C-alpha cells in the first residue's frame, strides 16, 4: 500500500510537470519567434550558426510540446513503451538545449559581427530600397540610436550629406528634422552597440529560464523512470 501510495503521488507530480512542460514549450516558441523577428531585420545575407539559434529554439519548443503529449498519454494509460519513449525524448531535448546554449555562447561575437556588417550594408541601400529604409528607421526609433557606430556613419551613405541623417535619428521625429540637424536634437549613439547591449541583457533572462526548464526536465525524467519501474513491477497506481 505504501508503494502504491507513493506511485500515486509520483503520477500526480508527473501530471503537474507535464503541464509545466507545455508552458515551457510555449515559452520557448515565443522566445524563438521573438529572436527570429529581431535577427530577420538585421542578418539577411546568409545563415550563421548564431542566426540559426532561434530556429533551433522554436524546434525544441515544438518538440517539447509533442513529448509532453506523449508523456501525458503514457502516464494516463500507464503504458511502459510510451513512458520509456517520453524519458528518452526528454533526455534528447536536454542535450539539444545544452548544445544550443553552448553554441549561443561560442558564436555570440560572430552574431554581432554579422549584425554590424549587415547593418552597414543596409545603410548603403537606404536611399534606394524602401523596405530597407523602413527596417532601419524602425530600429533607430525603437533603440533610440543613429547609424552603426554613431550618427556620423550616415555622412558616407549615398543620398546623404555631412549635415543630414534620416528623420528617424531625431529625438522628436518631424518631417525633415534630419536635414541640417543640431547634434543635441538627434540620437548620437550607434545601433550596433545599443542592440548588442539589449541582447546581452536579455541573454541573462533566457539563461535563467533555461536553467529552470532544465531543472523541470530532470524532475520529469526522474518521475518517468519511477513510474516505468512501477509499471514494470506490476503495481497498480490508478
From Swiss-Prot:
SUPFAM superfamilies: Tetraspanin. Residues 1-11, 73-81, 225-238 are cytoplasmic. Residues 33-51, 103-203 are extracellular. The keyword Nucleotidyltransferase does not apply. The keyword Membrane applies. One of its GO terms (biological process) is endosome to melanosome transport. Palmitoylated at a low, basal level in unstimulated platelets. The level of palmitoylation increases when platelets are activated by thrombin (in vitro). Keywords: Cell membrane, Endosome, Glycoprotein, Lipoprotein, Lysosome, Membrane, Palmitate, Protein transport, Secreted, Transmembrane, Transmembrane helix, Transport. One of its GO terms (cellular component) is cell surface. PROSITE patterns: TM4_1. Its main location: membrane. Pfam families: Tetraspanin (PF00335). It is a multi-pass membrane protein. A motif (Lysosomal targeting motif) lies at residues 234-238. The chain crosses the membrane at residues 12-32, 52-72, 82-102, 204-224. It comes from the Eukaryota. It is found in: Cell membrane; Lysosome membrane; Late endosome membrane; Endosome, Multivesicular body. Glycans are attached at residues 125, 130, 150, 172. Belongs to the tetraspanin (TM4SF) family. Functions as a cell surface receptor for TIMP1 and plays a role in the activation of cellular signaling cascades. Plays a role in the activation of ITGB1 and integrin signaling, leading to the activation of AKT, FAK/PTK2 and MAP kinases. Promotes cell survival, reorganization of the actin cytoskeleton, cell adhesion, spreading and migration, via its role in the activation of AKT and FAK/PTK2. Plays a role in VEGFA signaling via its role in regulating the internalization of KDR/VEGFR2. Interacts with TIMP1 and ITGB1 and recruits TIMP1 to ITGB1. Interacts with CD9. Identified in a complex with CD9 and ITGB3. Interacts with PMEL. Interacts with KDR/VEGFR2; identified in a complex with ITGB1 and KDR/VEGFR2 and is required to recruit KDR to ITGB1 complexes. Interacts with SYT7. This is CD63 antigen.
Amino acid at each position: 500500500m505504501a508503494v502504491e501510495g507513493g506511485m500515486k503521488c509520483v503520477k500526480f507530480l508527473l501530471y503537474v510537470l507535464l503541464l509545466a512542460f507545455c508552458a515551457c514549450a510555449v515559452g520557448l516558441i515565443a522566445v524563438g519567434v521573438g529572436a527570429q523577428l529581431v535577427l530577420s531585420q538585421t542578418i539577411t545575407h546568409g545563415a550563421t550558426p548564431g542566426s540559426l539559434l532561434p530556429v533551433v529554439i522554436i524546434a525544441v519548443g515544438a518538440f517539447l510540446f509533442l513529448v509532453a503529449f506523449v508523456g501525458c498519454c503514457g502516464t494516463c494509460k500507464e503504458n511502459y513503451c510510451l513512458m520509456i519513449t517520453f524519458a528518452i525524448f526528454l533526455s534528447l531535448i536536454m542535450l539539444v538545449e545544452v548544445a544550443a546554449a553552448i553554441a549561443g555562447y561560442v558564436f555570440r561575437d560572430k552574431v554581432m559581427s554579422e549584425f554590424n556588417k549587415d547593418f552597414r550594408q543596409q545603410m548603403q541601400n537606404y536611399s534606394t530600397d524602401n523596405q530597407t529604409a523602413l527596417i532601419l528607421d524602425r530600429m533607430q526609433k525603437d533603440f533610440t540610436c543613429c547609424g552603426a557606430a554613431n550618427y556620423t556613419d550616415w555622412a558616407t551613405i549615398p543620398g546623404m550629406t555631412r549635415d543630414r541623417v534620416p528623420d528617424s535619428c531625431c529625438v522628436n521625429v518631424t518631417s525633415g528634422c534630419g536635414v541640417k540637424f543640431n547634434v543635441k536634437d538627434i540620437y548620437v549613439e550607434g545601433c550596433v552597440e545599443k542592440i548588442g547591449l539589449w541582447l546581452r541583457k536579455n541573454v541573462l533572462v533566457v539563461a535563467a529560464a533555461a536553467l529552470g526548464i532544465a531543472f523541470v526536465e530532470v524532475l520529469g525524467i526522474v518521475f518517468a523512470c519511477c513510474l516505468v519501474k512501477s509499471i514494470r513491477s506490476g503495481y497498480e497506481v490508478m
